[in-house]
């Protein structure tokens, strides 16, 4: 009987030991995978920023290009002024969920359907020999199915679009998902964000923008609600609750 008990104890000991070892292995692998996923997310974001900045790679890797040409800065959206803080580690999405670091938008203000807006935003200055060449603005707004996240590169006049890219969205492939199509995005190049009265003027036009339009781009075929989402994204982020105050300072030449 004692021998049977000893055998059971040994078996249980082996099982418990194996379970602990497996648990440690799984936990270690999960932590390693999470770190790798974070690193990949940072690299992907940097890649999109370098792309929309129009930087020639010249055989260099993305992190090297980002470090050489891109300067992240924090902007107080209320005043449009640069503010202190670590722009490289600041998480704007997380800040927008924190009541102390964000504001709730009224239905009238929330044209992009984002609900809350962080008090501080990251902008990316594209520099060449310490002179700012462009500024990249992160914008997001609700499409048909998803929140759509974009980077918009603007010339130092604070008004002319240099490039745009959508780096995260979940719209219908072949329809709203065409926000990522380069031929559609290229329509934004050279468009003016504001009219002569400094009011947001970008228009996503259903059926197609008039040829030579200074502010208009074609709506996405078969994706009216996604197109509306793009329109509302620009309406919000170019306005007083978005980058409006900051871009006014850019227009006044405060970048250089």
UniProtKB/Swiss-Prot annotation:
Its UniProt entry gives the catalysed reaction(s) as: a ubiquinone + n Na(+)(in) + NADH + H(+) = a ubiquinol + n Na(+)(out) + NAD(+)
Q: What is its main location?
A: membrane
Q: According to its UniProt record, which cofactors does this protein need?
A: FMN
Keyword set, alphabetical order: Cell inner membrane, Cell membrane, Flavoprotein, FMN, Ion transport, Membrane, NAD, Phosphoprotein, Sodium, Sodium transport, Translocase, Transmembrane, Transmembrane helix, Transport, Ubiquinone
Q: Which residues cross the membrane?
A: 12-32
Its placement in the membrane is given as: Single-pass membrane protein
Spell out the activity regulation.
Answer: This reaction is tightly coupled to the Na(+) pumping activity and specifically requires Na(+) for activity. Inhibited by korormicin and 2-N-heptyl-4-hydroxyquinoline N-oxide (HQNO).
Disulfide bonds listed in the record: none
Q: What class of enzyme is it?
A: translocase
User: A GO term (biological process) for this protein?
Assistant: sodium ion transport
One GO CC annotation, please? Answer: plasma membrane
Entry's Gene Ontology molecular function annotations: FMN binding; oxidoreductase activity, acting on NAD(P)H, quinone or similar compound as acceptor
Q: Which Pfam families match?
A: FMN_bind
Q: Where in the cell is it found?
A: Cell inner membrane
Q: FMN phosphoryl threonine-modified residues are where?
A: 224
Q: Per the record's keyword annotation, is Transferase included, yes or no? A: no
Q: PANTHER family from the entry?
A: NA(+)-TRANSLOCATING NADH-QUINONE REDUCTASE SUBUNIT C
Q: What does this protein do?
A: NQR complex catalyzes the reduction of ubiquinone-1 to ubiquinol by two successive reactions, coupled with the transport of Na(+) ions from the cytoplasm to the periplasm. NqrA to NqrE are probably involved in the second step, the conversion of ubisemiquinone to ubiquinol.
Record-stated family: Belongs to the NqrC family.
Which protein, by its recorded name, is this? Na(+)-translocating NADH-quinone reductase subunit C
Recorded source organism is Vibrio alginolyticus
């Amino acid at each position: 009987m004692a021998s049977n008990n000893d055998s059971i104890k040994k078996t249980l000991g082996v099982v418990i030991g194996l379970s602990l070892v497996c648990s440690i292995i799984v936990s270690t692998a999960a932590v390693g995978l999470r770190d790798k996923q974070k690193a990949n997310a940072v690299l992907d974001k940097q890649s999109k920023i370098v792309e929309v900045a129009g930087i020639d790679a010249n055989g260099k890797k993305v992190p090297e290009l980002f470090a050489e040409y891109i300067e992240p800065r924090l902007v107080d959206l209320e005043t449009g002024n640069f503010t202190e803080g670590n722009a490289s580690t600041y998480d704007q999405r997380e800040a927008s969920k924190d009541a102390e670091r964000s504001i709730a938008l009224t239905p009238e203000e929330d044209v992009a359907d984002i609900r809350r807006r962080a008090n501080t935003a990251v902008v990316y200055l594209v520099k060449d020999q310490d002179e700012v060449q462009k500024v990249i603005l992160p914008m997001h707004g609700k499409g048909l199915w998803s929140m759509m996240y974009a980077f918009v590169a603007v010339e130092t006049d604070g008004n002319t679009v240099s490039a745009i890219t959508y780096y995260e969205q979940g719209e219908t492939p072949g329809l709203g998902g065409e926000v990522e199509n380069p031929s559609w995005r290229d329509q934004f190049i050279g468009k003016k964000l504001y009219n002569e009265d400094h009011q947001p003027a970008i228009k996503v036009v259903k059926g197609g923008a008039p040829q030579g339009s200074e502010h208009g781009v074609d709506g996405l075929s078969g994706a009216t609600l996604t197109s509306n989402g793009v329109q509302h994204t620009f309406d919000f982020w170019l306005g007083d609750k978005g980058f409006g105050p900051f871009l006014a300072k850019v227009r006044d030449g405060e970048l250089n």
